[in-house]
Amino acid sequence: MPQHIHMAGIIPVAGLETDFNQQLPDVMMPVDVGFAAIQKSVYECAMVGCQTIWIVANNDLAPIIRNTVGEWIYDPVYYETKTLFPSENRKEIPIYYVPVHPNDRDKRDSYGWSILYGAYSAWLVAAKISKWVLPEKYYVSFPMSAYDLPSLRTHRLEIASRDANFFLSYDGKTVKDELPIAFTFNGEDFKACRN
């Protein structure tokens, strides 16, 4: 049985560029009735077992997203558990909003940088609290991707495993092939990307 690790969910919004040309922010695009793309990513992070969720959105979009998403979500695995007192067994996952640092805007302001900055922010805040809550793994969910979310539950232990990174794939292609599909990375991968 794998050991429990702290996995932080990273949802990059800052630096997102699409060609949809609509009035609403692209992450607010509906993907189902009453379900926006950003809500899909938050639910996905909760479904795979993230203990915290970090949305990297600059100050222009963060209030809109916070109004839609909120500040926490129930873990779907614990929420769906049939027990005598279900409300006592529910687990809340906090959602944090982080803007890209002003010194990095218009210099290192890209979609990839918002992923790295989200991971850095999650680590920095946790380091100030306690070494016991430091993220050991990061799960990246892209709001503009679509796939079967309930199927991720079957891979929950594999995704949270310390042993290897997890990549979703489509036709044999992953994020390494520039597809915006979810993946995980650890602290060593983060250091390699920053250098």
Sequence positions of predicted segments:
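Short, glycine/serine-rich, charged loops/turns that create anion-binding
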Residues: 16-17, 60, 145
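Short, well-ordered alpha-helices that flank and scaffold nucleotide-derived cofactor binding pockets
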Residues: 43, 47, 67, 120
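Short beta-strand/turn micro-motifs composed of small residues
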Residues: 11-13, 32, 57, 142, ...
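N-terminal nucleotide-binding beta1-loop-alpha1 segment
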Residues: 1-30, 35, 39-40, 46-52
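Short internal beta-strands
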Residues: 52-58
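Conserved beta-loop-beta/alpha segment of the NTase-like Rossmann-fold superfamily
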Residues: 84-194
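Acidic helix N-cap motif at the loop->helix transition within catalytic regions
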Residues: 63-69
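Short mixed-charge
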Residues: 69-93
